[in-house]
Design a protein with these regions (language model features):
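Short structural boundary motif marking the start of a folded domain
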Residues: 1-4
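Conserved hydrophobic/aromatic beta-strand scaffold that supports enzyme active sites
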Residues: 15, 20, 64-66, 95-97, ...
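Short beta-strand-to-turn element immediately C-terminal to the catalytic PLP-Schiff-base lysine
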Residues: 6, 45, 68-69, 97-99
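Cytochrome P450 core scaffold surrounding the K-helix E-X-X-R motif
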Residues: 40-46
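Short glycine/threonine/proline-enriched tight-turn/helix- or strand-capping micro-motif at secondary-structure
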Residues: 10-19, 48
Length: 122
């Protein structure tokens, strides 16, 4: 899958083809439809955000998409569910694997783009 990767704070991010891992027992895999970008993401790219992951990493703190796989201990989501996820990183990719407790159900009345912009702002 394609993922925007940060490999150094003095280098521009670049798109890379990376493996999409299976979810752990408490995680969901999401086909990402939209990713919010905000001030915290800019700090991540500079390495100055309080929770900047170790290099290399995929930025993107908040996403919306469709669940495509659930870990064995996840009972509140099923494949096909629409969700918004405050993920902390990993959002600028085609798919992401996130802890299920960071996801909320997304009603059909909210678009993926709207949902991806809500989690940090509200």
């Amino acid at each position: 899958m394609l993922s925007l990767r940060v490999t150094g704070f003095d280098l521009p991010p670049s798109f890379c083809d990376v493996n999409s891992p299976p979810p752990a027992p408490d995680q969901i895999k999401v086909r990402i439809k939209a990713c919010g970008l905000n001030f915290a993401d800019l700090l991540l790219l500079k390495g100055t955000y309080q929770d900047t992951p170790a290099l290399p990493f995929t930025p993107g703190l908040e996403v919306a998409g469709e669940v495509i796989e659930c870990g064995a201990e996840v009972f509140n989501f099923t494949p096909g569910d629409r969700v918004a996820v405050f993920c902390g990183s990993g959002g600028l990719a085609e798919e992401g694997v996130f802890e299920a407790h960071r996801a909320i159900p997304l009603p059909d009345s909210i678009s993926y783009e709207e949902a991806a912009a809500l989690l940090i702002a509200y």
